[in-house]
Amino acid sequence: MIRNYTPADEAALLDLWNTSGTTLGFAPLDLEHFRGLLTRHPDFSMEYTFVLEVQGKVLGFANGCTGDHIPKGDVRGYVSCVILSSEADTAENTALLLAALEDAFRKAGRHYSAVTFFNPIRLPWILPGTPGHQHNNAPGIALD
């Protein structure tokens, strides 16, 4: 089932971030940093955060943001990340999460979605081939 995020999901999202997210290249985070970068970020909204729940377990999530204060935020929504557990990481589940997020953007009057550096939710990732060197604004969707 795809549904909106609730604060009770925060621990599950952090776990997904530090397991599946780090395999995608995102930098590992403790709870305080995760909150600052995502769940308590000023542009975070439960309206634009969706979870994939199966038999009571959160197996994935997608997050995005929008707003008139963001460059072109009056017409587009920004996709921050899509992270799925290894057991749920399928094209179908990715499509379900993205569809929920894009539908929420449409309901808010946005005409298209973007994965770009204009997104104010800047998620740190590890530069490939380095011993943990971070960059602060990763596109949040795998390219393969």
Where are these regions (language model features)?
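Short amphipathic alpha-helix that is part of the acyltransferase structural core
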Residues: 1-37, 49-53, 78, 144
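Feature marks short, surface-exposed loop/turn motifs that line or immediately flank catalytic pockets
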Residues: 20-21, 68, 119-123
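Catalytic micro-motifs at enzyme active sites that drive phosphoryl/nucleotidyl and oxygen chemistry
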Residues: 39, 66-70, 102
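Short loop/turn motifs at secondary-structure junctions and domain boundaries
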Residues: 40-44
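Conserved beta-strand in the GNAT
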Residues: 51, 57-67, 78
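Conserved acetyl-CoA binding element of GNAT-fold acetyltransferases
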Residues: 72-87, 118
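Acyl-donor-binding surface of acyltransferase catalytic domains
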Residues: 90-144
